[in-house]
Amino acid sequence: MGRTPELKLYNTLTREKSAFKPIDAENVRMYVCGPTVYDFAHIGNARPVIVFDVLFRLLRHVYGEDHVTYARNITDVDDKINARALRDHPGLPLNEAIRAVTEKTETQFHADVAELGCLEPSVEPRATDNIAEMIQIIEKLIGNGHAYVAAGEVLFDTKSMADYGELSKRPLDEQQAGARVAVDAHKKNPGDFVLWKLSSHNEPGWESPWGRGRPGWHIECSAMSRRYLGDIFDIHGGGLDLIFPHHENEIAQSRCAHGTEVMANVWMHNGFVQVEGRKMSKSEGNFVTIHDLLHTETFGGRKWPGEVLRLAMLMTHYREPIDFSIKRLEEAERLLAKWPTAEAGDAAPDESVLNALADDLNTVAAVQALHALAQPGNDAVFAASAVLLGVLPKKVEIDEAFAAAVDALVAMRLEVLKAKNFVEADRIRDELGAKGIQLKDGKDPETGERVTTWEVKR
């Protein structure tokens, strides 16, 4: 496996980069907030999936593949899902309509992230499979004075927790309710948030001590992370936008329910994603899904391979904002085209790549180090290093008949070039390009004659 580097990670909780010390090196545990399955995942959703996939790969390399548990949830109960189900399937009973939306969206999400080269997490819990665990935590919070029932809701009392706001570093009097949390008169404090709310007859619901209802957003992750990772685990990840209120409220629920000093030891957050220099939004007309990029020509007039999208993300440090642009994708594609297709075999990753990733996932330095390895004779080490980043170029299988046809056209192009028929030579090159073939012209070092090699564009 090679030398084990000291892993250093930036912790949002402490605002410091420090050495990572797992609770149990035999079972390193990481939780990352996954998708709410009401719509196809957009390019901003892709960033945490890719970032924490690289961390998952690194942890597996350092501690062993069987000694890392990565949980990434599926949020399949949410008012946005209900609204989408009613819009898209008005003729179906609500539960069937919700299932149609969530199953379709979840299937698409899995297909998208697979094309981005992401490993499957160790476990992928769904919120609807963990309702009993949520109810248990809520009962604990009511029992120890951290939650109360009002107007058909169970709410967390933010003033009952002395250090509420520690993650976001926002004083309580400055905290607003935030996304998905309504400010109502029945709350003791404006920042109190919903743990459980009653459901009407046409809304999904589960029986509870407080009546038929459904969970609030934040309690879902507290329940799922505890079930699969324990009261305290090593790393909790997600996007910068989740620090407040979602992660702040997860911490409050979990710590107050279980009497712990922390929920997770390290909190990691990736930066925002812009598209062509502007905030991505449907109103701006620049809302781009992963599916759009992979399978349509809506961005830059062409489809983009998953490995290009992934590398484009990794060319910016995960904590920095990223401007997702056609220029960036083209740059990533040019870089990939220079890299060999190879197999790692028993080779170990190069220390330069490993050290870069061990320094708070410095993928920028890791990509630069990987590019320096793309030299003749380095194929196995290059491949082992590329696997850590999940950017090993794919080897394309070509059938003999197709290869023979390409060889014939390449030979014909060489003949017309000798005759100085450059128009016809360009036509052949363009024809091959349309078939996904990239030509490379050079000279025979002994004869000085023009030679042309070809490869399938990646």
UniProtKB/Swiss-Prot annotation:
EC code: 6.1.1.16
Residues given in the record as ATP binding sites: K282
Recorded GO MF terms: ATP binding; cysteine-tRNA ligase activity; zinc ion binding
Oligomeric form and interacting partners: Monomer.
Co-factor note (free text): Binds 1 zinc ion per subunit.
Record-linked HAMAP family: Cys_tRNA_synth
UniProt keyword Nucleus, yes or no: no
Enzyme class (EC, first level): ligase
Cofactor: Zn(2+)
Catalytic activity: tRNA(Cys) + L-cysteine + ATP = L-cysteinyl-tRNA(Cys) + AMP + diphosphate
Stated name of the protein: Cysteine--tRNA ligase
Motif ('KMSKS' region): 279-283
Family: Belongs to the class-I aminoacyl-tRNA synthetase family.
Superkingdom of origin organism: Bacteria
Location within or outside the cell: Cytoplasm
GO BP terms, alphabetized: cysteinyl-tRNA aminoacylation
GO (cellular component) term, any one: cytosol
Residues annotated as binding Zn(2+): C33, C221, H246, E250
Gene: cysS
Motif ('HIGH' region): 35-45
Organism: Rhizobium etli (strain ATCC 51251 / DSM 11541 / JCM 21823 / NBRC 15573 / CFN 42)
UniProtKB keywords: Aminoacyl-tRNA synthetase, ATP-binding, Cytoplasm, Ligase, Metal-binding, Nucleotide-binding, Protein biosynthesis, Zinc
Repeat listed as a keyword: no
